[in-house]
C-alpha cells in the first residue's frame, strides 16, 4: 500500500495542523546552551518549512486560534488589572508604558530607516519583545485595515517573517541582559533585596519554611486547676500568652468545642493547637499533667484552601492586618496574577489575590467568609459565561470610531481582550460565576496560540526564502536594538526618576517584558524571590499594553509614511 504523504496532508487540514503542532512542540524542547527554543518558535519554524513546500490550512483556523489566545490573556489579567490604575501601582503602570512605548517608537524608526513595510516592522517588534500579543494585535488590525487581497497577504507574510527572524534574538539578548545588566549598575541586587526585606520584615530566602500546627492533648490535674484559679478560658488568655488555643475538651465522656466561658475542671481532657514553639511556652502545669493519646480528641480536620480576596475589609489591607494566626489559620502562599509572591506582612492585598491557607476546616471557612471566598475545587468550566463573553468581545470588535475623516475599528483582538478582562474581574468578585480551572485556561490559551502560529507560518513559508536574503542582516541589528534599548531606558527611568529599589525595579522590567526565564535569572542574582513583587506589578498590564501596541503600530503606520 502506497501512501502519498504530501497529498494526504494537503487533503486534510486537520491532520496537517496537528502534524505541524506535534513536530513543532518536539522542536520547541531543543536547547541551545541554556536557552530552550520554546513551543512558539518551534511550531513557527516547522510551519514555515512546510509552508515553503506549499502546504496550507484554512485561514479560519488561524483566526480562531488567535481569538482564543487573546481572550484567555484577558481572563488572566482581569482579577488584578484595575488595581494597577486605582492604587499604588502607578509606578508599575508607568514602567510598563515606558517599556512598550519606547519599543514601539524605536521599531517605527527602524522600519522607516530600513524602508520596511508595516508587516516586517510589526513582526520585528513582536519578535524582539518576545511578545505574541503584539503579533496577534497587529495581525488582527492588518485584516481590518488592508482591503487589497494581495497587499494583505504580503503584509501577513512579512509579519510572520519578522517575528520568526527576531524572536530568538529577543529572547537570548534579554536573558543575557538580565544576567549582566544588574552587574553594570552600582547597587548590588542582593543588597537591594535585603534592604526591602529589612524594611518590610520578610525573609529573603526564596525557599521559605512553613511550619504546620501541632495538636497535643492533656488531662487536667489539680495543679492546672490551681493555676487557672477559677478563671474561664477567656480570662486566662492562653492564646495571647502562648499562641496555643484549646480546640476541644472532653468532660464526662462528652467531646465538645469550648467557648470562652468554659472553666477547666479536674479530669477534663483538652486538646491544644499551635506551633511547636507555642507549645513550649505553655505553663508547666499543662505539660506536667498526663499527656493523652485519644483518637477523637486529637482528630482535627486540617484542610488547605485557596481563598480569593474580595471583601472590603481585606482589599487594600496589609497582610499582617488579617491576623490569620489569631483565627487558628496558617498562610502558605500568596498568588497574584498566577505569580507566587514572597510572604510579606506589608504586602497590600489586591482584589483577586489568592491566599493559600491551612487550618481546621471550620476556622478556614470562617476566615474565608471575612476575606472573600474559597475558590471552588471544580474541574468544570462555566462554558456559558465563557461563550457569552466571547460573543461580547466579538461584538465590541465590530465597533468603529470616527474622527473627522479618520476611522478606527476596535478589532477582534482589542474587543476580546476587553471582554476577557471583564470576565476575569467578575470571576474575582463572584465565586460561582465564570469559573475556569487554571489548567483548562492554560490549555486553551496555549492551544490557541499554537494554532495561530501554525497558520501564520504556513501562510508565510512560501515567500520566506526571497525575503530572508533581503532583510536578514537588518533584522538581526533591529532585533537587538528593540530588545535591549527599551530595557535600558526603563531601568534609567525607574532608577533615577521613580527612584525604585533595584530588586523591585529589575523584577518589574522583566514583568514589562513578560519574560519568565529572565525573571528567574534576576531572582538568582538577587538570591531572593523579592523581585517577584515587581514582576507581578507590571506583568498583567504589560500583556494588555503589548496587544494594544500591535494594533496601534498598524493604525499609525500610514500617517507616519505620509
From Swiss-Prot:
Organism taxonomic ancestry: Bacteria, Pseudomonadati, Pseudomonadota, Gammaproteobacteria, Enterobacterales
List this protein's GO terms for biological process: potassium ion transport
User: What is its subcellular localisation?
Assistant: Cell membrane
Going by the entry's taxonomy, the superkingdom of the source organism is recorded as: Bacteria
Please give one Gene Ontology molecular function term for this protein.
Answer: monoatomic cation transmembrane transporter activity
Task: Output the Pfam families linked to this UniProt entry.
Answer: Asp-Al_Ex (PF06826), TrkA_C (PF02080)
Transmembrane segments in this chain: where? 8-28, 37-57, 66-86, 94-114, 158-178, 383-403, 406-426, 447-467, 475-495, 541-561
Q: Which UniProt keywords apply?
A: Cell membrane, Membrane, Repeat, Transmembrane, Transmembrane helix, Transport
**Chain ranges of the RCK C-terminal domain:** 202-288, 290-373
What Gene Ontology cellular component terms go with this record? plasma membrane
Membrane topology term: Multi-pass membrane protein
Q: PANTHER family under this entry? A: K(+)_H(+) ANTIPORTER SUBUNIT KHTT, TRANSPORT PROTEIN YBJL-RELATED
**Gene3D superfamilies found in the cross-reference section:** Regulator of K+ conductance, C-terminal domain
Q: Which HAMAP family match?
A: YbjL
Q: What is this protein called?
A: Putative transport protein Spro_1639
Q: Which family does it belong to?
A: Belongs to the AAE transporter (TC 2.A.81) family. YbjL subfamily.
